[in-house]
Regions:
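Intrinsically disordered, low-complexity proline-rich regions
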Residues: 4, 9-20, 27-30
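A short acidic/small-residue loop/turn micro-motif
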Residues: 78-80
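Helix-adjacent hinge/juxtasegments
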Residues: 82-127
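Short hydrophobic alpha-helix segments
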Residues: 72-74
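Zinc-dependent deaminase
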Residues: 28-53, 116, 123-190
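Short beta-strand scaffold segments in enzyme catalytic cores
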Residues: 59-65
């Protein structure tokens, strides 16, 4: 939580370490945040640079903000966890949802050091934040071999024309779960 008191902002989520002092188990910031959106983005960028230095994954960071407070941070962990879904945005979404006790990020914003890839964009839409802010573009990422253009193109192709073999199988059996979902009283709609 952050609380702005005159020229002092008190919080447990550091945004700008240079203005940070530790008192009684909380971080105290001295000075005003000039532009919170830029500070949140700088934190995502800092995470991306820290990730490069640590060698834990690609140069990507993300933070999720609610009510002016960073509630979750994520950095790319693909290579350090052997999880191809552990992109910075997905890591941050998982942490934020756990923090909030919700599968939706109502009234949240996500700040990404780079324009989200197709997978992350899908995850972000499912999480339903109110805004996405990004720094680097997908072209910037493509220039260092993180090129997702082929995925965007594949999504647009008819299933039978995709490069990854995709074939429907046992639809009639699978429809049973769809029908169950329609009538169950145990579902939480989303």
């Amino acid at each position: 939580m952050n609380a702005e008191l005159g020229s002092i902002a008190i919080g447990v989520h550091p945004v700008h370490p240079l203005h940070l002092r530790w008192y009684a188990g909380i971080h105290v910031y001295f000075g005003f945040m000039q532009d919170p959106k830029k500070e949140f983005m700088r934190e995502a960028i800092r995470l991306s640079m820290e990730n490069v230095e640590s060698g834990k994954g690609g140069p990507f960071g993300a933070v999720i903000v609610k009510d002016g407070v960073i509630i979750a941070r994520g950095a790319n962990e693909v290579t350090s966890t052997n999880d191809p879904t552990a992109h910075a945005e997905v890591v941050a979404i998982r942490k934020a949802c756990k923090e909030l006790g919700s599968f939706q990020l109502d009234d949240c914003e996500i700040y990404c050091s780079c324009e989200p890839c197709p997978m992350c964009l899908g995850a972000i839409y499912w999480a339903r934040p109110k805004a996405i802010w990004y720094a680097n573009t997908k072209s910037d990422a493509a220039a260092i071999d993180f090129d997702d253009q082929f995925i965007y193109e594949e999504i647009e192709r008819p299933i039978g024309e995709r490069k990854l073999f995709t074939h429907q199988l046992l639809r009639e059996e699978a429809l049973v779960a769809i029908e169950q979902w329609k009538t169950t009283t145990k579902k939480i709609a989303y």
